[in-house]
């Protein structure tokens, strides 16, 4: 029985040690930015035994027996409230208490039955509201969890999964191979392009775009094994918003008029979340934010949110019993007529390859803060 293997690590026996350099940095920054909310989030983030995994079932090799077992063990389906968009084909289960289910091994020719993920990472996917036949771009796709989730929601006419880092690209390819049947592979393209070049390479091509941007991954950073490298990451953290803004500008170019864009990160950092979105809103005249506060009300049973000061933004933080996040989901925007961006030039960065790879590597252990940004052109503005 698969769930018999679920075990929790004994209290105090962590697989990794906390990195004091990072924790001190976060204490200083997030106490200022989040106030009392940081204290509760800190307790969860520093205690891996409290972390939870949701179980996303693969509709292309559906695990009926596992689903029965999950019900028997007290798991429940995610998003039991009525979201405006929630496809019946998307089945995700979670437990109220920390349970661990073993991940499946990759076997060539055999599709996996489920994918383990932080439940908060489904919020950007649902925010895209993917429909059958649409063209969708996952700009920073590795390790592939959100691409897999998108394919559980609908059958796109074309799914472009892009990843700039070569090591993570191999991981992405393996993930897709493990979950997607051969007939569906014909509508999926995998590329290794610098995301900042995608808008010029594929202008106004996509109905939906997901930018799950490289960021300072809070959970991963807290358990950095090398204090010197951790200090170096902290010193370079201020460069990340430049990269994120450049990726967003490129994504906007790749979005067709009337399309939708979602921006997400896995950090609580205001500079990488709210400030990035504010810069885009102030410098791009062809986008408009969309109020997503209703999603927070609908999802409050499973997630804890803190205010971002922006109607188009949601910040998910972990707390006891709702250990999902951190994840910031911000901004729904609508895109305006083509070629109407403000004249303000985008920020530039020297050494493109060097600056891009660093945050990609930091992002490798993503466990969930996301900020979402959604963009539409006024041609299909829905009030």
Where are these regions (language model features)?
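Glycine-rich nucleotide cofactor-binding entry segment
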Residues: 3-153, 160-182, 187-202, 241, ...
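Helix N-cap motif at beta-to-alpha junctions
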Residues: 59-62, 223, 353
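Structural detector for hydrophobic anchor residues on beta-strands
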Residues: 122, 160, 218-219, 327, ...
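Short glycine-centered segments of the SAM/dcSAM-binding site in methyltransferase folds
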Residues: 135, 158, 258-260
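Mobile active-site "lid"/loop adjacent to the S-adenosyl-L-methionine
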Residues: 154, 191-193, 201-250, 254-258, ...
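Residue-level signal for beta-strand positions within conserved beta-sheet cores that form or flank
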Residues: 155, 184-186, 285, 342
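C-terminal catalytic and target-recognition region of SAM-dependent MTase-like enzymes
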Residues: 262, 266-360, 368, 373-383
